Amino acid sequence: MRLYLASTSPARLALLRAAGIEPVVVPSQVDEPAAVAAAEAEHGPLSPDAMVQLLARLKAEAVRGALDGEPIDGLVFGGDSAFAIDGALHGKPHRPEIARERWRAQRGRTGRLHSGHWLIDHRGGVENAAVGATAVAAVSFADVTDAEIDAYIASGEPLEVAGAFTIDSLGGPFIRRVEGDPSTVVGLSLSTLRDLVRQLRIEWTELWNRAGVSL
């Protein structure tokens, strides 16, 4: 069973590989700010869960048709993440000054990482069904110093990740505690994805296709 990953996120790819799955990576072209603005114009402000679920769905739907002229035959997964603290929603900071401001505000405190999941059953080259769910993990930060923040930002790592932090790389020592599925903080909740796969009446182990992994 093939799993198509509608994302270029190295973290999501690494998670799936570690779980025994070698996905087919299909970059998804979604104008996220425009999509959120359009949804809010129609429905009003989106909750964090609603926003990440919307973007996860749009990413999956954007690549469900064909890949290099070949029909997609398998499951298509789209994911999105955002970090919320004090009622403010934080995506990727992109710029060092924004990442620095966020870290100075969140150090020593706790926020919530929201992760949206959307899975399309596209076996046989046609859409048979689609399911989605969100996962939330509480993240407590260490009371990091200004020097640590500056060094972390200089590495470039926090600029292109939701909330300006990672748990599986340089940012790991700055995370004091995680409540919830730890993989949620990395990029997708593996337990949530397994639940969605089973909702489609597919066994999770049918997705195992990495070298050295067999039933």
Swiss-Prot record:
The active site is at 80 (proton acceptor). It catalyses: a ribonucleoside 5'-triphosphate + H2O = a ribonucleoside 5'-phosphate + diphosphate + H(+); a 2'-deoxyribonucleoside 5'-triphosphate + H2O = a 2'-deoxyribonucleoside 5'-phosphate + diphosphate + H(+). It is found in: Cytoplasm. GO terms for cellular component: cytoplasm. GO terms for molecular function: nucleoside triphosphate diphosphatase activity. Its main location: cytoplasm. Its cofactor is a divalent metal cation. Its EC number is 3.6.1.9. The keyword Hydrolase applies. GO terms for biological process: nucleotide metabolic process. Keywords: Cytoplasm, Hydrolase, Nucleotide metabolism. HAMAP family: Maf. PANTHER family: BIFUNCTIONAL DTTP/UTP PYROPHOSPHATASE/METHYLTRANSFERASE PROTEIN-RELATED, BIFUNCTIONAL DTTP_UTP PYROPHOSPHATASE_METHYLTRANSFERASE PROTEIN-RELATED. Nucleoside triphosphate pyrophosphatase. May have a dual role in cell division arrest and in preventing the incorporation of modified nucleotides into cellular nucleic acids. Belongs to the Maf family. This is Nucleoside triphosphate pyrophosphatase. It comes from Leifsonia xyli subsp. xyli (strain CTCB07).
